[in-house]
């Protein structure tokens, strides 16, 4: 067999099937587009569902791809086995109603055994088939010439996921030889068994039946082929290494981890797990971020965060206790660049996101471990179980992974109350799901809508008023002829000027009706077959199917939306110009009142950057650029520099919104005719929505003017209160007042210290010796809650070897602070003192072993709390 690089195997596979008349389907982003059923693209066929289910017809019925994929259903196995991965590449060839079993098997055999391609030894190949698939057996045995002894019948060789296409499959195995195990059926040492000797290299699925609702199977009118070959596994065979991790896809990463850690791979089995986890997870994280995912606390973002934190935990077992994962991104980019340039193109952004996450997790670990250690102590003193509520709070409030809580609890021979934890998690999911319920409300109607094939033409680019016809009315999930006033309905027009919500632009609102009835249109979405689906309330009369109507869009709202949408394009271009090409749209909202734009950028924008972006947008508005809308081929659009939104799928003909030379972007939305119509652009806020994502909210036109007018009014009020005449004097006057306040506060603080000192007398005389420890636990007078910290500083300077606990009250609120000399923290911890004391005063608190703070709401319990401190130390 030929020894080849992974990149060579990938290219040979694609070249082979192109020779066989296949069309290359480019690898799709890992974040699914328009497929809510998937968290990630998890297979080669996942991106081709549109062809298999008939939604789209491919240019050619023969397709080949190398699709990057993520599977996270068994994360905990990654690192402990030879071939488990969260990120992998699936090579696949597919036939949509074209060739079938004979060609699929012949193609596979030729690619594997021909010297021109993989050059595998035929005698090392075995296959499995379904026992009843006599056709596959005949092809393998008679046409290919495979001995009957190398064709194994296995009942499980049938691809079936329930209702829908299904069929038998044949798997091809490579025998790596007796070095990987002697033949022994008792140990499953045979093709298809759980062993390291016979490796599955290719799975050919023959979709020839439809699995019906009544669990019967009927032949499909169009039979399909769906195959999959794991690139990592094939590479390990070609390079003759024991596991996928020793291939050129992983070893450069592992070599760098060796360099950073000073440890060696393949010396210690437990240590090897850490190397594998890091090498696998950094590939997944790098590609996922490059494809638009970002670490977060839910959904795919949580998967990324979990993977990164798992890798960091394993890196600590190699002695790496600082952020370093981000340094591996360039290595991943170099390995994968021949076919996936995206990681290298976005490497700086990816590294910044990962580094920030690593830094935050190291902080989280430190803080979370302190809290977890207290929970472990409590569990040991009670029922040996960490409460589910506490574990959830640790996860939800501090971001401490539940997996790590379980792991550390197990090390202490404790368990975690997971049922309660899961119950808390489910309640959190339920809260999140409430926000999504509206988007699912049409599922009842969807079966009706699927059957509506009539076209509905959108005429809203040219007009806001149009004479049309109601072709369909849906009420309570059923298609009806008439609906009375007061009811909410969904309906379709033969032609409509109403824009359906899309690309961040909200739907048009307005009215549809005639002399007999009127419908107030409140929303417009896309129906399953592409028509604009209007939602509205019948205002008067009886809405009737096939009625001729006047469709009128709210013109004022439309005009404001146009301004905000065109301004969004200018904003996007300005952000790229000012911040860099890594900026990509991560979400947008264009509505009449304002615009909101989410974009990928690491860290808050400076005020200077915000001002510059705002100025650039306004400059393009004042240049009065004609906005040209053109339809052209995707290739032509790219040639003129049109910006496409990352991850979006575009057809052969695209709509280009051209504000050249500043902004050229693919877009289906509605825009102004000239940028001067926008009038004015004003950013009102810049904030973060998650790791690596920033959000700008802005106003245009009249809204921007009114906002500035309000600011000017407030400024003039401030000027009047400050009693200054010139605008330029305002800042100087404020600075003067701030300095005066600072001086007065210092004087007040000094006076309070003097008063406290006089009242306290000689504080050294108040120190008690408790359990051979010097202790001062007392109440002090403070003017405000913050003053207790400065009071403590004074006490500490005089009593450096003393445990000090101070309590003060202001307006019925209690403030507590404790310090313990670092030399004594092995005996008593400030955090423990505060944590156990504050419940007495109706509060809570905590902190480090040497310093902690807290508060409460029951000043009448201060004496009791101070007595508790002394008793606590006495009983240590």
UniProtKB/Swiss-Prot annotation:
Enzyme class: ligase
Pfam family for this entry, one: tRNA-synt_2c
Co-factor: note: Binds 1 zinc ion per subunit.
EC number: 6.1.1.7
PROSITE patterns named among the record's database cross-references: AA_TRNA_LIGASE_II_ALA
Superkingdom: Bacteria
Cell compartment(s), UniProt: Cytoplasm
MF terms in GO: alanine-tRNA ligase activity; aminoacyl-tRNA deacylase activity; ATP binding; catalytic activity, acting on a protein; transferase activity; tRNA binding; zinc ion binding
Any one Gene Ontology BP term: alanyl-tRNA aminoacylation
Record carries keyword ATP-binding: yes
Keywords of this entry: Aminoacyl-tRNA synthetase, ATP-binding, Cytoplasm, Ligase, Metal-binding, Nucleotide-binding, Protein biosynthesis, RNA-binding, tRNA-binding, Zinc
Annotated binding of Zn(2+), by residue: 565, 569, 667, 671
InterPro entries hit by this protein: aa-tRNA-synth_II/BPL/LPL, Ala-tRNA-lgiase_IIc, Ala-tRNA-ligase_IIc_anticod-bd, Ala-tRNA-synth_IIc_core, Ala-tRNA-synth_IIc_N, Ala-tRNA_ligase, Ala_tRNA_ligase_euk/bac, DHHA1_dom
Entry cofactors: Zn(2+)
Gene Ontology annotations for the cellular component aspect, listed alphabetically: cytosol
Signal peptide: none
Keyword DNA-binding: no
Reactions it catalyzes: tRNA(Ala) + L-alanine + ATP = L-alanyl-tRNA(Ala) + AMP + diphosphate
Similarity field: Belongs to the class-II aminoacyl-tRNA synthetase family.
Summary of the function given for this chain in its UniProt record: Catalyzes the attachment of alanine to tRNA(Ala) in a two-step reaction: alanine is first activated by ATP to form Ala-AMP and then transferred to the acceptor end of tRNA(Ala). Also edits incorrectly charged Ser-tRNA(Ala) and Gly-tRNA(Ala) via its editing domain.
Domain notes: Consists of three domains; the N-terminal catalytic domain, the editing domain and the C-terminal C-Ala domain. The editing domain removes incorrectly charged amino acids, while the C-Ala domain, along with tRNA(Ala), serves as a bridge to cooperatively bring together the editing and aminoacylation centers thus stimulating deacylation of misacylated tRNAs.
PANTHER family the UniProt entry points to: ALANINE--TRNA LIGASE, CYTOPLASMIC, ALANYL-TRNA SYNTHETASE
Protein name according to UniProt: Alanine--tRNA ligase
